[in-house]
């Protein structure tokens, strides 16, 4: 008989723990989720799952007694909570103060007491102290912003600040008549002739020709250096004395010619820099 009672107690715990967890999680999801729609959906789903578990548990415990009374009491409270959720969802937040007294009266509890012992009403009342504090903070922040704009600090070069209007900014920031037409102007507002700032065409052509000649000279020097290097390798690799003399006879004029070209190009570069 004792073993049978122990089995009943374990089965009762298996029944009530999911119901308790479902009710607590539903209330938490309904209170603390950021999205109201997701909170309502999750709370409804959890409540429906808890109701299904409760129905299966009710059919499981077919005996009469205090356990079945507790299950009936839980069913009534659960249905009332589900109705409250649906009514709040349909009517909005205004249905909360209307349903709370009805539920309190049905349960048998009195009105909640505040910190000073007085009964607290279900409706929200404005707190004058909180409104005054919010008003003072808003006014102080607004005055700070106005003072920062009115100071209009100068830059390091003494130019007026960007926050100033064009009339107060000075002569350097006044819009000239040519700026409205999209023309380039100087600091005084006078138009600038872009053709005067461009170099003459002869100078440009001279620079192009000089750059082309320098490029051709570099290519010529590179070819001569490669030819001298090839002859030097042939001279080092030649084992026959006659072959070495032949390569040396060709290498000496190439080296002298390369030295003359290098000296001539250096002289031209020096004369060009002197100009």
UniProtKB/Swiss-Prot annotation:
It is found in: Mitochondrion membrane. Residues 140-191 are annotated as: Disordered. It is a multi-pass membrane protein. GO terms for cellular component: mitochondrial membrane. This is Uncharacterized mitochondrial protein AtMg00670. The chain crosses the membrane at residues 15-35, 39-59, 70-90. The keyword Metal-binding does not apply. It comes from Arabidopsis thaliana. The lineage of its organism: Eukaryota, Viridiplantae, Streptophyta, Embryophyta, Tracheophyta. It comes from the Eukaryota. Keywords: Membrane, Mitochondrion, Transmembrane, Transmembrane helix.
């Amino acid at each position: 008989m004792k073993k049978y009672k122990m089995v009943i107690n374990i089965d009762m715990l298996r029944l009530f723990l999911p119901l308790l967890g479902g009710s607590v999680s539903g209330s938490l999801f309904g209170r603390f989720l950021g999205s109201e729609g997701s909170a309502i959906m999750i709370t409804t789903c959890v409540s429906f799952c808890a109701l299904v578990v409760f129905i299966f548990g009710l059919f499981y415990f077919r005996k009469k007694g205090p356990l079945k009374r507790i299950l009936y009491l839980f069913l009534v409270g659960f249905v009332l909570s589900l109705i409250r959720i649906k009514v709040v969802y349909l009517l909005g937040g205004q249905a909360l103060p209307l349903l709370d007294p009805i539920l309190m009266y049905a349960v048998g509890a009195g009105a909640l007491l505040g910190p000073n012992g007085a009964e607290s009403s279900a409706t929200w009342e404005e707190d004058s102290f909180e409104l005054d504090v919010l008003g003072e903070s808003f006014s102080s922040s607004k005055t700070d912003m106005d003072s920062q704009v009115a100071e209009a600090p100068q830059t390091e070069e003494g130019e007026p600040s960007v926050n100033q209007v064009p009339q107060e900014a000075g002569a350097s920031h006044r819009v000239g008549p040519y700026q409205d037409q999209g023309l380039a102007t100087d600091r005084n507002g006078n138009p600038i002739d872009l053709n005067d700032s461009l170099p003459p065409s002869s100078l440009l052509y001279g620079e192009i020709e000089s750059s082309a000649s320098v490029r051709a000279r570099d290519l010529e020097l590179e070819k001569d250096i490669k030819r001298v290097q090839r002859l030097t390798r042939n001279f080092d690799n030649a084992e026959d004395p006659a072959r070495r003399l032949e390569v040396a006879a060709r290498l000496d004029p190439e080296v002298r010619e390369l030295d003359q070209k290098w000296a001539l190009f250096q002289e031209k570069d020096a004369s060009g820099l002197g100009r």
